[in-house]
UniProtKB/Swiss-Prot annotation:
KW Transcription (keyword) present: yes
Organism name: Caenorhabditis elegans
SMART domains the UniProt entry points to: HOX
Gene Ontology terms for molecular function: DNA-binding transcription factor activity, RNA polymerase II-specific; RNA polymerase II transcription regulatory region sequence-specific DNA binding
DNA-binding region(s), chain positions: 117-176
UniProt subcellular location: Nucleus
Record-level GO BP terms: amphid sensory organ development; epidermis morphogenesis; neuron development; positive regulation of transcription by RNA polymerase II; regulation of cell shape; regulation of transcription by RNA polymerase II; sensory perception of touch
Gene name per UniProt: alr-1
UniProt feature, compositional bias: Basic and acidic residues: 1-17
Biased composition annotated in UniProt, kind: Low complexity: 322-343
InterPro entries xref list: HD (IPR001356), Homeobox_CS (IPR017970), Homeodomain-like_sf (IPR009057), Paired_Homeobox_TFs (IPR050649)
Key words of the record: DNA-binding, Homeobox, Nucleus, Transcription, Transcription regulation
Entry protein name: Homeobox ARX homolog alr-1
Length: 362
C-alpha cells in the first residue's frame, strides 16, 4: 500500500507540472458519465490554459483579409523597386567592369561565392576589321586553320574570330533578304551613256549626218553619170551604153554603223518607227529629185536608158540562176555586146574617124 501512495504522489506531481488539475474517478460511478465528465474536464483545462489556445483566423473572403493582402503586396513591390543606393551601386559595378575587365571575359565571384564567367563586347580596330573583311570576301565559312591563322595575325582568340564570322554571315543574309524581297523596290536606273563623254551625243549626230550626206552625194553622182551617158547616146544613137554604173534602187536607205547613235538621235522613243519614217521621207525627196533631173533629158535618151537597165536586170537574173561567179552583170553584158556584134566595130571605127578630123582641125 505505501508503494501505491508513492505512485499517486508521483502522478500528482506530473499533473502539477502540466498545470492541469488531477483527475479523480468517483467510486461506483457509471463509465458513460465518467467519460462525459472527463471530456468536460479536458475542455475546461484546454480553455483555461492560454498556451494551448488556437489563434483565431478571419474568414477567407472578409474585407479585412482582402485589405491585409493588398497591403502585403504593396510592401513586396516596394522592396522590389530599386532605390537610389541600388542604382549607384550598379553604376559603380559597371564602371569597374569597363575599366578593369579584359575584352573576352573574366571570372567574377557570385553572391553565393561561385565563380561565374561573364562575356563583354569586343572592340575591333580598323586593321582587324580590314583583315576579317578580306577573309570574309574570300569565303563565308573559313575552316579552323584559317581562323587560327587569322586570329594570330589580328591578335585575337579563335573564338572571337568565329563569333565575328557568325555575326557577319547573319548581317549578310539580312542585307540580302532586304535587297531582294523588299516590297517597295526602287525603279531600275537607266544607265547614262553620256556621263563620261558629254559630247558623245553630238559626235554621234555628226556621224549620222555625215553618213546621210555621203549617201546623198553618191546618189547625185550616179544621177550625173546617167545623165552624161544619156547625152552621149543622144549624140551617137547607134553606140550602146557600156558603162558599168551600179543600178540604184527606188528607195535609198542610209546605213548606220552605230544603232545607239540613231536611237539617241530620235530621242530613244520607238526608234524603229522613227527610222522608217525618216527613210520614207528621204526616199520621197530623192524620187522627186530624180524625176526633176529626168524631166530635163530628151524622151529618146530616157527610153534608151530604160532599155539598157532592163537588159542589165535580165542578165543579172540569168547569171544568178546559173550560179556564175562573174564580178558584175553589167560588165559581162557590156563585154558581150562589144565583142559579138560586128556593127559595134563599125560604129567604133566611125567614131574614131570622126574624132581624128576634129583633133586635126583643133
Amino acid at each position: 500500500m505505501p508503494e501505491l501512495k508513492k505512485e499517486d504522489s508521483s502522478k500528482d506531481e506530473k499533473d502539477l507540472d502540466m498545470n492541469c488539475p488531477p483527475l479523480h474517478r468517483p467510486n461506483g460511478a457509471d463509465l458513460n458519465q465518467y467519460s462525459k465528465s472527463l471530456m468536460e474536464q479536458l475542455q475546461a483545462q484546454l480553455f483555461a490554459n492560454p498556451a494551448l489556445q488556437f489563434p483565431s483566423f478571419p474568414p477567407a473572403f472578409s474585407i479585412a483579409a482582402l485589405t491585409n493582402n493588398q497591403h502585403e503586396l504593396k510592401e513586396d513591390d516596394g522592396k522590389k523597386t530599386p532605390t537610389g543606393d541600388n542604382i549607384l551601386e550598379a553604376a559603380s559595378v559597371l564602371d569597374n567592369r569597363e575599366n578593369g575587365s579584359p575584352s573576352d571575359g573574366t571570372n567574377s565571384p557570385d553572391d553565393n561565392g561561385k565563380r561565374k564567367q561573364r562575356r563583354y563586347r569586343t572592340t575591333f580596330s580598323a586593321f582587324q576589321l580590314d583583315e576579317l573583311e578580306k577573309v570574309f570576301a574570300r569565303t563565308h565559312y573559313p575552316d579552323v586553320f584559317t581562323r587560327e591563322e587569322l586570329a594570330t595575325r589580328v591578335q585575337l582568340t579563335e573564338a572571337r574570330v568565329q563569333v565575328w564570322f557568325q555575326n557577319r554571315r547573319a548581317k549578310y543574309r539580312k542585307q540580302e533578304r532586304s535587297s531582294t524581297h523588299h516590297p517597295y523596290q526602287a525603279p531600275m536606273s537607266i544607265p547614262n551613256s553620256n556621263g563620261d563623254n558629254p559630247y558623245q551625243m553630238m559626235l554621234s549626230q555628226e556621224a549620222i549626218f555625215a553618213a546621210i550626206n555621203q549617201q546623198a552625194a553618191a546618189h547625185l553622182l550616179n544621177e550625173q553619170v546617167r545623165i552624161a551617158t544619156s547625152d552621149r547616146r543622144s549624140q551617137s544613137p547607134s553606140v550602146p551604153v557600156t558603162t558599168s554604173s551600179p543600178i540604184l534602187p527606188t528607195s535609198v536607205t542610209p546605213t548606220f554603223q552605230n544603232a545607239d547613235a540613231l536611237n539617241m538621235l530620235f530621242g530613244g522613243i520607238t526608234p524603229v518607227t522613227q527610222q522608217l519614217l525618216y527613210v520614207q521621207q528621204f526616199s520621197r525627196a530623192m524620187d522627186a529629185f530624180r524625176t526633176q533631173l529626168l524631166g530635163s533629158v530628151p524622151a529618146g535618151a530616157t527610153a534608151e536608158v530604160t532599155d539598157v537597165v532592163a537588159l542589165k536586170t535580165e542578165d543579172s537574173k540569168s547569171n544568178s540562176r546559173a550560179g556564175s561567179s562573174s564580178p558584175t552583170p553589167t560588165e559581162s553584158s557590156g563585154a558581150a555586146a562589144t565583142s559579138t556584134s560586128p556593127t559595134n566595130f563599125a560604129d567604133m571605127n566611125s567614131l574614131i574617124s570622126d574624132v581624128k578630123p576634129k583633133e586635126e582641125s583643133s
